[in-house]
Amino acid sequence: MYEGAVQELIDELGRLPGVGPKSAQRLAFHILEADPEDMKRLVTAITTVKERVKFCTVCFNVTEQETCNICRDQRRDPSVICVVEESKDVLAVERTRSFRGRYHVLGGAINPIAGIGPEQLRIRELLTRLNDGAIQEIIIATDPNLEGEATATYLARMLKSIGITVTRLASGLPVGGDLEYADEVTLGRAFEGRRNALL
């Protein structure tokens, strides 16, 4: 264990998702050895993103404006909404270039162990978006893991009574995997082969 500021930096870096103790230590020493100007730019970038970035008032994707560029894009199909867990999943889907509709970011997935139920997700906001009648299809693109499947099943059952088409991405995505790590071809094929969400 190191002392003072070095250990504090390692501890803070270790709190980041996917960063274990060894990675935190490597990052801390990289920061210590890096050019001070590079580190000033990094600190500025982190501060700027925390000050400027917020959630789109329509879909809850990240943006620096009131609505994100996807919601503002008139070339996108407003009748189809792809429901994802997190903003990073929007980027994963966009990389496929297979989807030209709009999005809705739930802000997570149902996970009773972590105390996350439907009330903690942006499901109410999704239902509000459906009120105008313009939406004809909801594509559920939650992660193919236990929490993602629970969320997809909950949404499909809830939306069934509304009378819109509800589909789920096709297989090809590994069970237990994360959408953001799927390659573009696999994710693109999953969109093409999507199926009815309630079988």
From Swiss-Prot:
Family matches, as SMART domains: TOPRIM
Write down the InterPro entries for this protein, in alphabetical order.
Answer: DNA_Rcmb_RecR, Rcmb_RecR, Rcmb_RecR_Znf, TOPRIM_dom, TOPRIM_RecR
CDD domains hit by this protein:
TOPRIM_recR
Provide a GO biological process annotation: DNA repair
Toprim domain sequence ranges: 79-174
Q: Which domain of life is it from?
A: Bacteria
Family statement: Belongs to the RecR family.
Classification via PANTHER family: RECOMBINATION PROTEIN RECR
Designated name of the protein: Recombination protein RecR
Q: Which organism is it from?
A: Paenarthrobacter aurescens (strain TC1)
Lineage at the top is: Bacteria, Bacillati, Actinomycetota, Actinomycetes, Micrococcales
GN (gene name)? recR
